[in-house]
Amino acid sequence: MTRNKVEICGVDTAKLPVLKNEEMRKLFREMQSGEISAREKLVNGNLRLVLSVIQRFNNRGEYVDDLFQVGCIGLMKSIDNFDLGQNVKFSTYAVPMIIGEIRRYLRDNNPIRVSRSLRDIAYKA
């Protein structure tokens, strides 16, 4: 059986850990009490989430490494802003933030600039 995982940004995607929901909640509590290593474990435990999101943006002409790094920025922002008081799974909260960071990156690095008013007209048509 062959593995389809690759190394992106120096990270071997085949060896990425996956956190369970209970582990994630425990790490969020530790992070909120000030433990820095808990944040690092949360980031490392959710890198597969970033990988699954960047697959949507594969055919945009951008390097996968760049998309992965930008997705990780969105992941870190979502980890910092996540509230355990809400009854929401972390992945449900994080995916829109990761997508938003990637879209912002793609929009800002696009060589063709389209004004917002023209874009709005195009969406209405």
Swiss-Prot record:
Keywords: DNA-binding, Sigma factor, Transcription, Transcription regulation. SUPFAM superfamilies: Sigma2 domain of RNA polymerase sigma factors. The keyword Transcription applies. GO terms for molecular function: DNA binding; sigma factor activity. One of its GO terms (biological process) is DNA-templated transcription initiation. PROSITE patterns: SIGMA70_1. Sigma factors are initiation factors that promote the attachment of RNA polymerase to specific initiation sites and are then released. Belongs to the sigma-70 factor family. This is Putative RNA polymerase sigma-G factor. The lineage of its organism: Bacteria, Bacillati, Bacillota, Bacilli, Bacillales.
